Amino acid sequence: MVVSELAARLNCAEYKNWVKAGHCLLLLRSCLQGFIDREVLSFHRGLLAAVPGLGPHATCRGGSRCSPRARQFQPQCQVCAEWKHEILRHHINRNGDVHWGNCKPGLWPKDPWEVAKAFMPRGLADKRGPEECDAVALLSLINSCDHFVVDRKKVTEVIKCRNEIMHSSEMKVSSTWLRDFQIKIQNFLNEFKNIPEIVAVYSRIEQLLTSDWAVHIPEEDERDGCEFEIGSYLSVSQIHEIEIELLKEKLQEMYLQAAEEEMLPEEISNQLDVVKGFLGSNTDLRNGLTEDLQKLESLHLQHQKQTSKDAGRQTPERKA
């Protein structure tokens, strides 16, 4: 771990703001996990109480025919059809996109989390609980399920900020943006004044966003760490872990966008070049992201080959 590389990165105010905002989202995710876990269980119990026939003794009869694909799901048995109806009844976006591909419908009678994933963004099929999800997945669940009684405008404002963080090609945000983000995330947290673990993170986020991180590069005989004006010490490895987690989430987001063809190949290529250039200049970060980077590059290469092949088919052969 190279302290001087970290100091150089945080010497860029806009990158430091990006890391601060991302760190807030990590804190938000952590404080929401227990609350979400309890509420998902409560929601599932409520569904079973309202429609007892959907309970643990109900069995999917459709087998593989009841397997959803992305946003498409046509149940082939009565149990899955009734579950789909109940999920849509509680879905705020019931007439829009529902990512059924996240779910294993056969588990809906017994597994509350499989039901919850129908209210979340794409790409979560392998997630087994809130502890494995990022902030936007948990925020989307709160926003999309009518079990959660909140001001949804406040939720969508934070989701929008998160997307701006992850879609920032150069991983930078301005101080003005950060102040606006602080207002929006605090407005959201104020919706949960009766949830102790969420209340507890409010002051931590406030301190984090209003302090000016002062990086201390220690001498050889000093302890290996970075001193912050908030009065606590974060080791180089802790800051490194925060950066890695944010960059990993960014690469995973880019992968999903590429897989769903939500971005043009040249846009993916440009963003990929920026990230590779950044990691090339920051070797202390690069090693922790090799697998995610290779996965994205491999998918991008497949798309490029397919695009070239399609273009070749469309080009008429010249006559000799």
Curated annotation (Swiss-Prot):
Instruction: Report keywords, A-Z.
Output: Methylation, Phosphoprotein
Sites bearing Omega-N-methylarginine, chain numbering: R61
Identification of the protein by name: Uncharacterized protein CXorf38 homolog
What Pfam families does the record tag this protein with? DUF4559
Basic and acidic residues composition-biased segments: 307-320
Return the annotated region ranges for Disordered.
Answer: 299-320
Q: Which InterPro entries match?
A: DUF4559
Point out residues bearing the modification Phosphothreonine. T315
- What domain of life does the native source organism fall in? Eukaryota
